[in-house]
């Protein structure tokens, strides 16, 4: 069995360099919620050094609230903003001899695109316009995954090690209790259940079906590095290969 392990980087966390030795894919902030040209260059350089797949992590224009503010923007605006961000990272990667491999939206852009078909379409269209060979990463079973497939893009369905799930397979909003899993044992058990058995127990006790092709590790968690190491060790014990 094989699984991709990804982390959001270039967001001002001190653990980026170490996380890049543990993950197989990096989602690099493109300036709209965090990061800038220099951090994008630095993350690309480290990703290349560690053989980690390079990905863009575009966001709504919301540095004030780290891309977590809900926005109702016209689809054409979202298309242009997404194309702008991923185009910048693709060029930075190419300038350093690397190749951008995937795109994963950030924060509220990701969450809204999971449920809003027009928004999902705008993102998928921007990814396709930039490079039809790019992989589009989205929440398992979401509108974003459906939109990507409609454009003929390769898609990758994502699950979260440290997020609570609702009965319909969507994430518990961060504003609600149960959104974040602080207990390492619980996060580890949830991850293995999703990867090995394709299901996750919701906060209300029901099982939701999920397709786990990539697991997100949040680099901003208090114990992110320790958990990442433990997850890698557990995957090795279960003969689960980590690869992009």
Swiss-Prot record:
Record's Pfam families? Answer: LamB_YcsF
Question: Corresponding gene?
Answer: pxpA
Q: Where is the signal peptide?
A: none
InterPro entries in the cross-refs: Glyco_hydro/deAcase_b/a-brl, LamB/YcsF/PxpA-like
State the name under which the record lists this protein. 5-oxoprolinase subunit A
Please tell me whether the keyword Ubl conjugation is annotated for this protein: no
Write out the function statement from the record. Answer: Catalyzes the cleavage of 5-oxoproline to form L-glutamate coupled to the hydrolysis of ATP to ADP and inorganic phosphate.
Q: What is its EC number?
A: 3.5.2.9
Q: Give the top-rank taxon of the lineage listed in the UniProt record for this protein.
A: Bacteria
Q: Which UniProt keywords apply?
A: ATP-binding, Hydrolase, Nucleotide-binding
Q: Which reaction does it catalyse?
A: 5-oxo-L-proline + ATP + 2 H2O = L-glutamate + ADP + phosphate + H(+)
MF terms in GO:
5-oxoprolinase (ATP-hydrolyzing) activity; ATP binding
Question: What's its top-level EC category?
Answer: hydrolase
Subunit structure comment from the entry: Forms a complex composed of PxpA, PxpB and PxpC.
Q: Which GO terms describe its biological process?
A: carbohydrate metabolic process
Q: Which family does it belong to?
A: Belongs to the LamB/PxpA family.
User: Organism source for this protein?
Assistant: Escherichia coli (strain ATCC 8739 / DSM 1576 / NBRC 3972 / NCIMB 8545 / WDCM 00012 / Crooks)
């Amino acid at each position: 069995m094989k699984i991709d392990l990804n982390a959001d980087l270039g967001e001002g966390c001190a653990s980026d360099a170490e996380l890049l030795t543990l993950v197989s894919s990096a989602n690099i902030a493109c300036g709209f919620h965090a990061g800038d040209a220099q951090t994008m260059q630095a993350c690309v350089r480290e990703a290349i050094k560690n053989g980690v797949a390079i990905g863009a992590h575009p966001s709504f224009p919301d540095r004030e609230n780290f891309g977590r503010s809900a926005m109702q923007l016209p689809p054409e605006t979202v298309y242009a903003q997404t194309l702008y961000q991923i185009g910048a990272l693709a060029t930075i990667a190419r300038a350093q001899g690397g190749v951008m491999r995937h795109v994963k939206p950030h924060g509220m852009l990701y969450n809204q695109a999971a449920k809003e078909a027009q928004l999902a379409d705008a993102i998928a269209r921007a990814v396709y316009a930039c490079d039809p060979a790019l992989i589009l990463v989205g929440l398992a079973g979401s509108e974003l995954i459906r939109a990507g497939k409609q454009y003929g893009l390769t898609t990758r369905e994502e699950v979260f090690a440290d997020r609570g799930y609702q009965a319909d397979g969507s994430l518990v909003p961060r504003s609600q209790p149960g959104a974040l899993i602080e207990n390492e044992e619980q996060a580890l058990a949830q991850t293995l259940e999703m990867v090995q058995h394709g299901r996750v127990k919701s906060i209300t006790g029901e099982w939701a079906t999920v397709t786990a092709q990539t697991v997100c590790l949040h680099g901003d968690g208090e114990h992110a590095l320790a958990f990442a190491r433990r997850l890698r060790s557990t995957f090795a014990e279960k003969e689960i290969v980590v690869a992009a």
